[in-house]
Amino acid sequence: MPGYYALKPSGSQFMFNLKADNHQTILTSERYESKQNAQRGIESVRENCRDDARYTRKSSKASEPYFTLTSTNGQTIGLSEMYSSTAAMENGIESCKRNGPSLDEREPA
């Protein structure tokens, strides 16, 4: 079963999380001024998630690995959680590649 996008309001703005089928968050977006812009961000994830060159592997100040997904214009689309190891981060990237193409968008009731 593929993952899904959880689209939700954040104050007066909107954001989304890409979630795996077990409901674990894989990628968190920035905040967008409108729901329509957040939906464009979701479309950008779909378009870019399978291209390994779109992922930037990073390390936090506490040496925790994480990744960002960027669009072809270099803008960050989303940010992962902090992982306990590089291998766990690579698994997160693979999960993003598998679940990112999902057409399933969900909003809170």
Locations of the language-model features?
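Short, mixed-charge low-complexity intrinsically disordered segments
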Residues: 62, 70, 102-105
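Cysteine/selenocysteine-centered motifs that mediate thiol-based redox chemistry or coordinate metal-sulfur cofactors
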Residues: 57-62, 107-109
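Intrinsic N-terminal pre-sequences and regulatory tails
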Residues: 1-4, 109
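A structural feature that tracks compact, well-ordered secondary-structure segments
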Residues: 6-8, 15-20, 26-32, 41-44, ...
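Intrinsically disordered, low-complexity regulatory segments
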Residues: 10, 20, 102-109
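Short arginine-rich
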Residues: 46-54, 97-106
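Alpha-helical recognition helix of canonical C2H2 zinc-finger domains
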Residues: 38, 89
